[in-house]
């Protein structure tokens, strides 16, 4: 099991435009062991951390049956989400979690 309180670096594998200020970020945890042991259920969220800026709670929107892929759909509305919106595929951010009760 992954320690949800540690920040785990993740690479943006794809940035998918959903609407003018909304993007889905397909993330991949950088550490192989963390990736292998990371599990979540529908309804949970991660704290998405941008180094030097802060963090924000974002729901995991990917399939729990594919835990090595972490998708988060983010609307650019505040300081942290606006900074995340500037990132592109290949860049790194941090993930803490998962948190919350699944369905």
Predicted regions and their residues:
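Short, charged beta-turn/beta-strand-edge "cap" motif at the junction between a beta-strand
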Residues: 52-55, 97-102
């Amino acid at each position: 099991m992954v320690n949800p309180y540690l920040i785990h670096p993740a690479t943006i594998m794809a940035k998918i435009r959903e609407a003018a200020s909304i993007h889905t970020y397909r993330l991949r945890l950088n550490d192989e062991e963390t990736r292998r042991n990371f599990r979540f259920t529908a309804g949970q969220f991660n704290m998405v951390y941008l180094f030097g800026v802060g963090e924000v709670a974002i729901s995991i929107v990917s399939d729990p049956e594919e835990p090595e892929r972490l998708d988060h759909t983010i609307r650019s509305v505040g300081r942290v989400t606006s900074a995340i919106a500037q990132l592109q595929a290949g860049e790194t951010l941090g993930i803490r979690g998962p948190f919350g009760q699944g369905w």
